[in-house]
A protein has these predicted regions:
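Primarily recognizes the serine-hydrolase "nucleophile elbow" in alpha/beta-hydrolase
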Residues: 73-135
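C-terminal catalytic histidine-bearing segment of alpha/beta-hydrolase fold enzymes
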Residues: 170-226
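Short beta-strand element of the alpha/beta-hydrolase
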Residues: 20-28
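N-terminal cap/lid segment of alpha/beta-hydrolase-fold proteins
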Residues: 1-18
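Alpha/beta-hydrolase active-site loop
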Residues: 60-79
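The feature captures the conserved acid-bearing segment of alpha/beta-hydrolase catalytic domains
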Residues: 118-170
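Conserved alpha/beta-hydrolase
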Residues: 45-61
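The serine-hydrolase catalytic nucleophile loop
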Residues: 30-41, 56, 158
Length: 226
């Protein structure tokens, strides 16, 4: 892993060597918490999918939009123009959906989007509004894989189920898969109550969840065995 600047003063961790198989992995609401998803990022890189995991600030005046778009531009450049896999956790999943639906307007090429416990009732940091408002006319549908945790007490599976239904109405393919995970472990993290934050977790149970998530991502995005 190496740390780079994707924009002045803004950091991202790069796992593997970006190229045709590259994912952009956005953490959740917690400001500048790229380290929280390092276990998942490394698991994906170990399987051949390079990962760029940037910091972003959901509490910035623009809701993190400038960070998110700058990181997407950086990832696209690092991938030599190849299409990106976009992975987002919690609010990052909402942002991933928002970027994907408007990718043609934002000059980003997205091949597949994976949302981990996406909090789809929250405002989309990309558009600043409801992500379910739909894609621009003429947008090419991108496949979505929505992963939920059966022990998630923060974001219910119904959020992903309802969002998937709304995607299908506008002709975008969407699959929902429920896993034995909680809100943190689905992204390789644990919640620290005393500090009210998430951090990376490498305990055996979380590792098992991460392995399952990584295998699903590789299988659904067509990068298995690379």
């Amino acid at each position: 892993m190496r740390t780079v600047e994707y924009a002045p003063g803004r950091s991202a961790d790069v796992y593997g060597t970006p190229g045709p198989a590259t994912a952009l992995l956005w953490h959740g609401t917690q400001t500048d918490s790229r380290a929280a998803v390092q276990i998942l990022a490394q698991a994906l890189a170990d399987r051949g999918l390079a990962v760029i995991a940037p910091d972003w600030d959901s509490h910035a005046p623009d809701g993190g939009r400038s960070d998110l778009l700058a990181s997407a531009t950086f990832a696209q450049q690092q991938a030599s123009g190849a299409g990106l896999v976009i992975i987002g956790w919690s609010l990052g999943g909402v942002a991933a959906a928002g970027l994907t639906l408007r990718a043609s307007e934002l000059n980003v090429v997205v091949t597949h989007t994976v949302c981990l416990s996406g909090a789809f009732w929250a405002d989309d940091p990309i558009s600043g509004g409801v992500v379910q408002s739909g894609a621009p006319a003429g947008a090419v549908p991108t496949p979505f894989t929505l992963l939920t945790g059966d022990a998630d007490d923060v974001v219910p599976a119904s959020a992903s189920i309802e969002f998937a239904a709304e995607l299908r109405v506008i002709g975008w393919p969407a699959e929902v898969i429920d896993l034995p995970a909680d809100h943190g472990s689905i992204a390789g993290a644990r919640y620290v109550p005393d500090e009210d934050r998430y951090e990376a977790a490498d305990d055996p149970q979380t590792r098992n969840v991460v392995d399952a998530v990584a295998e699903l991502i590789l299988a659904r995005t067509g990068h298995s065995g690379r």
